[in-house]
Every structure is written in structure tokens, then in C-alpha cells.
Amino acid sequence: MIFRDLKEMGILGINNRVGRYILRHNKRSMYPLVDDKVLTALRAEAWGIAMPQNYLIVENYGSLKNLHSKLLNYDSFVIKPANGSQGNGIIVIKEIIKEEKDGEIRLLCRRSNDKLMDIDEVKHHISGILSGLYSLSGQSDKAIIQAKIDKHPIFSNYSFGGIPDIRVIVFEGYPVMSMVRLPTKNSDGKANLHQGAIGAGLNLKDGATNNAVIRNLVVDCHPDTGFKLSGLQLPFWREILELAAQCYDMVELGYLGVDIVLTPDQGPILLELNARPGLGIQIANLAGLVPRLEKVRLEAPKNLLAKDRVKFSMENF
């Protein structure tokens, strides 16, 4: 009974996602461009697509010796694994505290949750990243020290601590579904659904929120701010969808998750890409992916520019 109901709603399951869409539409040879955030950044730069600036790439344990002096150049930053997933291993440093004593500068890092880390703790965390603790494959990895992005004022009342991001599912270059992920206290200020962030579905026609869930349970208000979650209208909506559509051209993956952040000064910029995007976006939108994917497969024109593909999506979904 439940299976039939889900099928009638057009809900895409894990097996069909892999068999009908990922395996058929994603070239394995292109996966490194998406899985490795360092390669993604290089590709995006070549395509003129804005991303957060990478300050440092830590590739081996020897590089940790000079880390202290290098971090003194920054007021804030983000540490993330190059090949991580689901937000694991990411630490946001919102403030660098520099204390001078006996001619030496001591460095303390204040995290987004206000906890302090000294330089040895930072090195220890990066060592874990290098060992592959957070990587998709479990193999050794690189650590990225990246510019911290400021929160767009539209989210002031809808986010606890961290920066919300926007997930767009793109199929053969056409945006088919989207949601905004809003950090909560329970998610430790991270826009991560698995850790307790809010997933709020977005109407493709106008970028307004239509429904919201926490751990698959429908919610009406943000648990930490009390603000109502429905009807939030995102600015730069067409630009957000066009950026997502352009990422298909950039990496040539037919079934793609595109994560975008809204910045106060640059507008929408690319955060990262995902070749195996999760299915929780359907619950956030109370809608199934299958009808939209099949409409693109059967009816969408081929060889259109990104802006024209976005026009089709906004009119049909």
C-alpha cells in the first residue's frame, strides 16, 4: 500500500536514482571534478563561475609545521576536506584571536558555535582530514582552508549560527527541484539535514518556500528564531537557477546536485557539487522527482543555453 502510494506520487527511490539516472547520465570519468573540491574550484575558475576563495590547500603532514604563521594572515576561515560529504569534517572559524606573549603570537580560533580551538587542535583536526577520516573513499585526502562566507540578510531570522545553502537538482541541464537548508542549534549551525538542519522546499517558478521539514517531520516555524518558514522569497532567483544550469555545462554530469550560497556582496555563488544528491529534497517539497525528470527526458528541447533551460523549468515546474 505504502509502496503504491509513493509510486503514484512519483517519489524517486535509491535504486531508481542509481539505475535510471546516475548510471545512465553521469560519466564516471567526470566524477573527480565533482568529488574533489579542489578540482571543482579550478574548473569553476576556468568557466568564470564564482566560488569561495581557497586560501590554502594542505596536502601533507609536513605542511602543518608552518600552518600557524599562514593562518595569522586571516581573520576567519573554513576548514573542509577536499573529498568530504554531508558536511562531515567542516569547521567554521568565525574569529581569529591573536595574543602576544614574550614576543610570540598565540593563535586561538573561535568556531561558529563559540567554542575555542588552539593551533594544536586545528592541526589535529586537519591531520584527521589528511588521513581520510572524512573522505568519500576513505583514502587519504587534502584539507582546504577557505574564505568564510557572510550570511545574506534575507536569512537573518531563518538561520542559527551558520550559512544557509540552496540545493538545486539539475537533470540534463534543467533545474527540476530545489530547497534551502537552514542551520539550527541542533545542527550545530551547519546547513546539514542529517544533523538537524531545516530543509525548506522552494517553488521553481519564483523561489518562495512552500514547505519545511526537520528530520523528515513537517515544521511551520524555525525552532530557534520562531519565524514562520513558509513564504520566504529568495532574491536573485533566476540567477540562482542559471548558475545551477551552467554547472551541468561545466562538468557534463546529467544528474547533479548543485549547492549555492547567497552572499551579501556577490549574490549567488557556487559552494560545491554532488554527483549523488540525496532524495530528502522530495520530502522538503512534498513532491516526487520522477514526473519532473521524465518530463525533461521526454519533452525538454536539446542544446539550449542555460538561461533558456531555466525558462523551461520555471514554466513547467
Where are these regions (language model features)?
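Active-site nucleotide/adenylate-binding loops and adjacent lid/helix of ATP-dependent enzymes
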Residues: 20, 25, 33-164, 172
